[in-house]
Amino acid sequence: MLDKSRLRIAMQKSGRLSKESQKLLEQCGIKINLQQQQLLAFAENMTIDIMRVRDDDIPGLIMDGVVDLGIIGENVLEEALLTRQSQGDNPCYVTLRRLDFGDCRLSMALPMDKPWNGPKCLQGKRIATSYPHLLKQYLDKLGINFKSCLLNGSVEVAPRAGLADAICDLVSTGATLEANGLREVEVIYRSKACLIQRSGNLSKTKQSLIDKLMIRIQGVIQARESKYIMLHAPAERLEEIINLLPGAESPTVLPLAGNQHRVAIYMVSNEALFWETMENLKNLGASSILVLPIEKMME
């Protein structure tokens, strides 16, 4: 039986969010040993339990107060919310923040040989999907009537099997659609992974731990988006060079030993440093230009 005094976090056991969720928790300093078939794991260095479940179970675990935090795709969360609302429930939860992985889109797709002149083409059509409520919400706003065909997997084969005229499914690259003779025609929902918390009061211990995790998650995400830049530059071109660099803060400028005409510049960049920028820096006299990844960051 779970110790209710420990913080409980639900994450996807397997699937497109599983590895990134585990990586995020580990980068936040949570020491866990997740075996392939293990559904429950205990952090070695924090009072945290990790529950590994199906992604579509996570919203219910949060809304019913079984776990404290969950990492879930916004598409799954919104579908679960609409499902419960359609049943007369009023589920509650708190979205703490969007995360920097799990990008996808929920899109309409048609067979390659079918014409597309906008959503009105779907009037009266049969549409296969795993997201019936998101689909209904979108088409209801446009005043389009349709017939829903609920499938929990292999949605893309529905038109070829004669089950549906079109599909509404998650798309990342579009390769699966193309392999099944389909083309993406309309994006109805864009999604990323997010961190959610159950509603209601938590103990001071749990809330303090969540606050600590939020600071660490912010640091991990900011570090992923930032680079540490080091270079040598002529002192007379210093202002021009600094203006080229997209910095999070003002750079550190130090004199080079034995060379009064050149300086060393160190800075954290919160934007990508492209090859063109590096070439422009070199044209201004910069040398020994290094762009390094940042593992952790706290402001």
Curated annotation (Swiss-Prot):
PROSITE patterns hit by this protein: ATP_P_PHORIBOSYLTR (PS01316)
Named in its record, the pathway it takes part in is:
Amino-acid biosynthesis; L-histidine biosynthesis; L-histidine from 5-phospho-alpha-D-ribose 1-diphosphate: step 1/9
**Keyword annotations from UniProtKB, A to Z:** Amino-acid biosynthesis, ATP-binding, Cytoplasm, Glycosyltransferase, Histidine biosynthesis, Magnesium, Metal-binding, Nucleotide-binding, Transferase
Q: Which cofactor does it need?
A: Mg(2+)
Which SUPFAM superfamilies does UniProt cross-reference here?
GlnB-like, Periplasmic binding protein-like II
Q: Which Pfam families match?
A: HisG, HisG_C
Q: Which GO terms describe its cellular component?
A: cytoplasm
Q: Which domain of life is it from?
A: Bacteria
| Molecular function per GO | ATP binding; ATP phosphoribosyltransferase activity; magnesium ion binding
Q: What class of enzyme is it?
A: transferase
Cellular compartments annotated: Cytoplasm
**Catalytic activity, as annotated:** 1-(5-phospho-beta-D-ribosyl)-ATP + diphosphate = 5-phospho-alpha-D-ribose 1-diphosphate + ATP
Q: EC number(s)?
A: 2.4.2.17
User: A GO biological process this protein is involved in?
Assistant: L-histidine biosynthetic process
**Activity regulation description:** Feedback inhibited by histidine.
Assembly and partners are described as: Equilibrium between an active dimeric form, an inactive hexameric form and higher aggregates. Interconversion between the various forms is largely reversible and is influenced by the natural substrates and inhibitors of the enzyme.
Give the protein's biological function. Answer: Catalyzes the condensation of ATP and 5-phosphoribose 1-diphosphate to form N'-(5'-phosphoribosyl)-ATP (PR-ATP). Has a crucial role in the pathway because the rate of histidine biosynthesis seems to be controlled primarily by regulation of HisG enzymatic activity.
Q: Which family does it belong to?
A: Belongs to the ATP phosphoribosyltransferase family. Long subfamily.
Name of this protein: ATP phosphoribosyltransferase
Origin species: Blochmanniella floridana
Q: What is the lineage of its organism?
A: Bacteria, Pseudomonadati, Pseudomonadota, Gammaproteobacteria, Enterobacterales
**Gene giving rise to this polypeptide:** hisG
